[in-house]
């Protein structure tokens, strides 16, 4: 049985070489093959993200390269913006599933600027990994959107987690845990999601 393949997209502010991305690449390699890529503006040294159609085109181009290499199920996983753009790609491309590491539901943290239209249009199974302290995705708003989605969707909440799924030192001490413990539970949730959806 072919191993799953993760196409791992970065967030707006940190390219694929960022330590956070590299850490999660290493974790994901325990489940399947992993390919990282960068959007055009990152490769060109820019700070401001490209217009959404250009981001989607770059993401689809990276996916096309993966299809040449993999016969297994392909999952689009992304940090923040990378997860959101992956959702747009899934409206145009067939993939096994979507995994969003900190979905940026509220544009700029503004509860009135919801990026929920694409979520409501999705048919592809999706897993949200979400910190409960993330100002870009308040838990109550995400639950409201999830309840109205057509796509099979699930949530792994990271209690006390921020937009990068990191806990405060106080939170870790109170729970008697390390960040690695938290990360391993996230990885287990991803592994379970992949197992349930890879060959649907």
Language-model region placement:
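Conserved alpha/beta-hydrolase "acid-adjacent" motif
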Residues: 17, 135-141
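A conserved short beta-strand
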Residues: 94-109
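Short beta-strand immediately N-terminal to the catalytic nucleophile in serine-hydrolase-like folds
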Residues: 73-78, 101
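Serine-hydrolase catalytic machinery in alpha/beta-hydrolase-like enzymes
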Residues: 2-74, 85, 165-175
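C-terminal catalytic histidine-bearing segment of alpha/beta-hydrolase fold enzymes
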Residues: 153-200
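The conserved beta1-alpha1 loop
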Residues: 7-11, 102, 130
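Gly/Ala-rich beta-loop-alpha elbow adjacent to hydrolase catalytic centers
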Residues: 78-82, 86
């Amino acid at each position: 049985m072919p191993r799953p393949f993760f196409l791992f997209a970065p967030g707006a502010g940190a390219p694929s070489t960022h330590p956070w991305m590299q850490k999660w690449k290493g974790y994901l390699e325990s489940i399947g093959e992993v390919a990282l890529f960068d959007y055009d503006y990152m490769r060109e040294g820019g700070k401001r993200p490209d217009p959404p159609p250009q981001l989607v085109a770059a993401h689809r181009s990276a996916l096309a390269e993966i299809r040449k290499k993999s016969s297994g199920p392909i999952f689009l996983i992304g940090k923040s913006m990378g997860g959101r753009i992956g959702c747009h790609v899934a409206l145009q491309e067939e993939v096994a599933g979507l995994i969003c590491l900190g979905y940026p539901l509220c544009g700029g943290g503004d509860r009135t600027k919801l990026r929920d239209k694409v979520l409501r249009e999705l048919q592809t199974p999706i897993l949200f990994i979400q910190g409960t302290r993330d100002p870009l995705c308040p838990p109550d708003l995400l639950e409201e959107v999830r309840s109205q989605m057509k796509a099979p969707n699930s949530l792994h909440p990271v209690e006390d987690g921020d937009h990068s799924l990191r806990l405060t030192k106080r939170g870790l001490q109170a729970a008697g845990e390390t960040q690695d413990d938290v990360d391993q539970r996230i990885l287990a949730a991803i592994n379970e999601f992949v197992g349930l959806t890879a060959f649907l």
